[in-house]
Amino acid sequence: MLSGRPQEHQISSELRRRRAGILAVMFAFGVIYATWATRTPAIRDELGVSIAQMGILMMGLSAGSMVGVLSSAKLISKFGTRRIIAVGVTVSVCALALIGIFTTFESSPGVAIGLALVGLGMGISDVALNIEGAEIEHLTRRSLLPALHGFFSVGTVIGALAGIGFSAINLAPVYHLCLAAAILGPLATWGYLGIPRGFGIVDKGAVAGAAAATPAEAAAPDGPVQSDSAPDTSAPAKQRSVLLDPTILLIGVIILAMGFAEGSADDWLPLLIVDSQGASEMAGSLVYTGFAASMALGRLAGGAFVQRFGHAQVLAVSAVMAVFGVLGVIYAPNVAVAMAAVLFWGVGSSLGFPVAISTAGNTSDRPIARVSAVTTWGYAAFLVGPPLLGFMGEHIGLGNALLLVAALLVLAAVAATVLTRRLRSQLPLPEGP
């Protein structure tokens, strides 16, 4: 059975530390991502590569993330969330420094390997962090996932501000990235040490991690745990049934589009501003900081809106806001207008991942399998997005390539409207802000 659930008399103090721990780790991942994103113009120039080639390099990050996500369920079921998060964040922190070192040696393959390792660490940790967040929501009956992803965005703001400063003084990326890694290492260690041991582990003979029940269900006398003599041979079929569930398909379309919107800004926004507006690297970092700040604001305030209006309704409105933001940045006549438009892009994209995951996880019907499934949909966008936009940008311009993002967001708004009808009387919302 799943182990590691805190006892009732310990729950308040343990949950506070546990919550702080996963927030700290998510913050560290945000700083890592922004540290890379804000220095992409400088890294591109040092490597001497084109937009299409940058897209291929970024595919390393996405491919690593996808491998991490796809392998996370089995790894979590064997080792537990704490160990997976510890390994994942350690790999990502070390790989950030490697990216800077390989940039100095003008090694594009080395940078691609570093990005793949960053993505791998983020991918395996992200699923584990979301499972931790969903479990804390289950225990406290309070919304947490928007705030959890909000701390990622807070990390991107801090990382982006540092990127602005270091870009302004023309600090070489290697020094910037290695300094960030040295600072984030102790913070991440403190974070994962607050996560209880053993949570997420499935004993031999239980349902595989991706098809496991919540801890409460697994502990129940009539829970899904099976004996060693009767292994669950239907687990693959159950996983396929989750992936083909109409509700999961709708959520998958939404998180795919929202992931595309978020990932395209993370990967291409500084370069878009530098190339399309003829702006400096510092200006590109400043616009990206505006995006990151609006993402953080949307996620930190989003729980109240989800509580009031419901998951699917918030997703629909968010998609529409993101459409206007993306189009505004594409057709902005100057950097100031792009900065204003990017705020809509950021707020609109901010709740896509956390609210979609929360929608999938707030169910008694195999929530871990559902969270894993929709997370895979989201990371598919990060896998396909960078090289696709890079290839399109090389031929039709990066701004025109981003019209694909706007089109996907329109599709997400339609899917969220359909999802609203399906969930109106089915999904209980967490209590409290």
Region locations from a protein language model:
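C-terminal ends and interior cores of transmembrane alpha-helices
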Residues: 90-105, 321-333
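Helix-to-loop junctions at the C-terminal end of transmembrane segments
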Residues: 68-81, 167, 298-311, 393-394
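Short amphipathic helix-loop junctions that connect adjacent transmembrane helices
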Residues: 38-52, 267-283
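Hydrophobic core of transmembrane alpha-helices in multi-pass small-molecule transporters
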Residues: 27, 106-125, 337-350
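C-terminal transmembrane helical hairpin of 12-TM major facilitator-type secondary transporters
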Residues: 309-356
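Intracellular juxtamembrane helix-capping segments at the cytosolic ends
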Residues: 123-139, 350-365
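Symmetry-related core transmembrane helices of the 12-TM Major Facilitator Superfamily/SLC fold
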Residues: 174-193, 402-418
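Primarily marks hydrophobic transmembrane alpha-helices of the MFS/SLC 12-helix fold
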Residues: 82-85, 315-316
